[in-house]
């Protein structure tokens, strides 16, 4: 999944769970996590404190965990995103199959 799709997917989750959209900092952190960067690397690249990046990340993980029903962490973030893409593709195929069967 490309980064723009990841951001849109997480923003949809954020809106569902909190009623708010992603901040610029959230998007920066998501991009860094998607690239596999450490909190320190994300912080250094964008002039943030690494503790702040960690806090923002954990906040995103909590929201994603609440929406998805299973724990999201820095260790499984990429796996979760990949899994969500697989599920999204399956849902599309099921909808297409149902549409064909209903004709």
Predicted features and spans:
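An N-terminal, helix-rich hydrophobic module
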Residues: 1-90
């Amino acid at each position: 999944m490309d980064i723009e799709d990841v951001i849109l997917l997480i923003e949809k989750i954020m809106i569902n769970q909190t009623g708010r959209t992603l901040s610029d900092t959230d998007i920066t952190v998501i991009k860094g996590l998607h690239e596999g960067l450490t909190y320190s690397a994300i912080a250094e690249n964008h002039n943030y404190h690494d503790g702040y990046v960690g806090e923002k990340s954990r906040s995103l993980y909590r929201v994603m965990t609440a929406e998805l029903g299973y724990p999201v962490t820095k260790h499984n973030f990429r796996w979760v995103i990949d899994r969500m893409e697989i599920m999204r593709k399956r849902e599309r195929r099921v909808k297409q199959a149902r549409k064909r069967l209903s004709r």
